[in-house]
């Protein structure tokens, strides 16, 4: 981290103008730059191209050195569009990696990959900046305590609980609710934990980024009157950005989160939507950098790139970064190298199912596919563990019986199996929950359900005490008391209809 004596923008100081090169070749987002002998920039140094295009428009493009080619040439990846650049243009070596503003000044603001504000709310205090490339914390600094991170979402807290300071993956194909789940987590965590969040929008839709910002302003997560009281900093490198920006925007967000952890000694939440786009951007650039493609056309450096990002997301003795990452699964194939590489780094996986989404059960979290290293009796306690296992067993048995039901019907099942199916259907519906951020779509007010309430509810269903209630009563409710109240209401309505 660098403390700059004065607040200055990302411009280049006169000191750093000593090292000048010229553009030798441009292939899409990749530039080759020739430097004088003995004046080669280091790998990851930021280069700035300044000048005017043929129409006289001002050009200011920042690039990052990726390779030293020999013959006094370097190959760099542009962080913004290369429109208007021509061969022979002057390139300035800044002598350091990209640095971005960090600290309280970033809260409530939206940044791009370079740490420049893009929300039209004026300049940001850049006296404290930090380079985006750093080493992961040393082993001796790491914190190894286990504790649960309560989210207020029943299916998550019961069946695949999150670890404080852990890494969580949200897996799902297109349109099954990854972004809505992330928005709900930001909302719940800001309200229940009062923690600071950093949101990295990596290669996703600009519209979603805008919706998220508006939503945060409405819910008070971003305080427009006093930005310093906001609970989140936003960093966007959306779908329309060049691959260089999408490849580095995750590191920009992580750098801001690291400052809150290491200097402010806070517990931080880092949201990355979507980690697959980080890999995708790397693969777009990889071929242009002259690397041989690996399996399924991905970059050969896939594991290294992923590791260098993920190893920095961890808990230290000062504070923690709990990271929740949406993972787009291409063609719903979990064996694809991108999601498969991500799996290796995660403490918990929340898998979203298209089948459940089609049934209208939201959040569409697959209770049997989602996993967590925290679901052990010595960590969560015997009661929680037993309840979770019995819920899974009931749902698994229901899954096994579905073929028989489809062919022969429910009547052919034994009494015991029919009871299991009835309870499993209630459990399936009780795992749904109205979200605060989806109130406008569902018309139901959002619900935050504490862990103790969640366990109590599922124990009652499993014990058979609620066998007499209709399964519809368990759909889109908060705790179990709401389900019993809804059952009474449904009974009244049916009597009135008669």
Curated annotation (Swiss-Prot):
Function: Produces ATP from ADP in the presence of a proton gradient across the membrane. The catalytic sites are hosted primarily by the beta subunits.
InterPro entries: AAA+_ATPase, ATP-synt_VA_C, ATP_synth_F1_bsu, ATPase_a/bsu_AS, ATPase_alpha/beta_chains, ATPase_F1/V1/A1_a/bsu_N, ATPase_F1/V1/A1_a/bsu_N_sf, ATPase_F1/V1/A1_a/bsu_nucl-bd
Gene3D superfamilies linked: 2.40.10.170, Bovine Mitochondrial F1-atpase, Atp Synthase Beta Chain, Chain D, domain 3, P-loop containing nucleotide triphosphate hydrolases
EC numbers on record: 7.1.2.2
Subunit structure: F-type ATPases have 2 components, CF(1) - the catalytic core - and CF(0) - the membrane proton channel. CF(1) has five subunits: alpha(3), beta(3), gamma(1), delta(1), epsilon(1). CF(0) has four main subunits: a(1), b(1), b'(1) and c(9-12).
Any one GO molecular function term: ATP hydrolysis activity
Catalytic activity: ATP + H2O + 4 H(+)(in) = ADP + phosphate + 5 H(+)(out)
SUPFAM superfamilies: C-terminal domain of alpha and beta subunits of F1 ATP synthase, N-terminal domain of alpha and beta subunits of F1 ATP synthase, P-loop containing nucleoside triphosphate hydrolases
Family: Belongs to the ATPase alpha/beta chains family.
Stored NCBIfam families: atpD (TIGR01039)
Protein name: ATP synthase subunit beta, chloroplastic
Residues that bind ATP: 172-179
Subcellular location: Plastid, Chloroplast thylakoid membrane
Keywords associated with the record: ATP synthesis, ATP-binding, CF(1), Chloroplast, Hydrogen ion transport, Ion transport, Membrane, Nucleotide-binding, Plastid, Thylakoid, Translocase, Transport
One Pfam family of this chain: ATP-synt_ab_N
Gene Ontology cellular-component terms listed: chloroplast thylakoid membrane; mitochondrion; proton-transporting ATP synthase complex
Organism lineage: Eukaryota, Viridiplantae, Streptophyta, Embryophyta, Tracheophyta
GO term, biological process aspect, one: proton motive force-driven mitochondrial ATP synthesis
Topology of this chain in the membrane: Peripheral membrane protein
């Amino acid at each position: 981290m660098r403390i700059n004596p004065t607040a200055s923008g990302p411009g280049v100081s006169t000191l750093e103008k000593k090292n000048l090169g010229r553009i030798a070749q441009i292939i899409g987002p990749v530039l080759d730059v020739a430097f004088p002998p003995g004046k080669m920039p280091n790998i990851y140094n930021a280069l700035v191209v300044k000048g005017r295009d043929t129409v006289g428009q001002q050009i200011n493009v920042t690039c990052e050195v990726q390779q030293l080619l020999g013959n006094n040439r370097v190959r760099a990846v542009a962080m913004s569009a290369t429109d208007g650049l021509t061969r022979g243009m002057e390139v300035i070596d800044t002598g350091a990696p990209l640095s971005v503003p960090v600290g309280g000044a970033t809260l409530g603001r939206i940044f791009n990959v370079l740490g420049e504000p893009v929300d039209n709310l004026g300049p940001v205090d850049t006296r404290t900046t930090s380079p985006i490339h750093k080493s992961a914390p040393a082993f001796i600094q790491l914190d190894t305590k286990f504790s649960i991170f309560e989210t207020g979402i029943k299916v998550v807290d019961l069946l695949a609980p999150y670890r404080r300071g852990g890494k969580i993956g949200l897996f799902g194909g297109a349109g099954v609710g990854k972004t809505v789940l992330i928005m709900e987590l930001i909302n719940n965590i800001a309200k229940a934990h009062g923690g600071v969040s950093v949101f990295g929008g990596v290669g996703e839709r600009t519209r979603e980024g805008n919706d998220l910002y508006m939503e945060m302003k409405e819910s008070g997560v971003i305080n427009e009157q006093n930005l310093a009281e906001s609970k989140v900093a936003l960093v966007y490198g959306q779908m329309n950005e060049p691959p260089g920006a999408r490849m580095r925007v995750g590191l920009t967000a992580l750098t801001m989160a690291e400052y809150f952890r290491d200097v402010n000694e806070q517990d931080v939440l880092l949201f990355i939507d979507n980690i697959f786009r980080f890999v995708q951007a790397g693969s777009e650039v990889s071929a242009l950098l002259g690397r041989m493609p690996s399996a399924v056309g991905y970059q050969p450096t896939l594991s290294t790139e992923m590791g260098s990002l993920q190893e920095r997301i961890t808990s230290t003795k000062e504070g923690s970064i709990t990271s929740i990452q949406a993972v787009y699964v291409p063609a719903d194939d979990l064996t694809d190298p991108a999601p498969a590489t991500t799996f290796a780094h995660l403490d918990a996986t929340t898998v979203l199912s298209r089948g459940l989404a089609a049934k209208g059960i939201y959040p569409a979290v697959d209770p049997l596919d989602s996993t967590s290293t925290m679901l052990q009796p010595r960590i969560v306690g015997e009661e929680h563990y037993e309840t979770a296992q019995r819920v899974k067993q009931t749902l698994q048995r229901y899954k096994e019986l579905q073929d028989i039901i489809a062919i022969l019907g429910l009547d052919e099942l034994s009494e015991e199996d029919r009871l299991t199916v009835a309870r499993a259907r209630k459990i399936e519906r009780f795992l749904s929950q109205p979200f605060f951020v989806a109130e406008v779509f569902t018309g139901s007010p959002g619900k935050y359900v504490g862990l103790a309430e969640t366990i109590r509810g599922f124990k009652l269903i499993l014990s058979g005490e609620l066998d007499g209630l209709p399964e519809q009563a368990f759909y889109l409710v908060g705790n179990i008391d709401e389900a019993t109240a809804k059952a009474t209401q449904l009974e009244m309505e049916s009597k009135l209809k008669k």
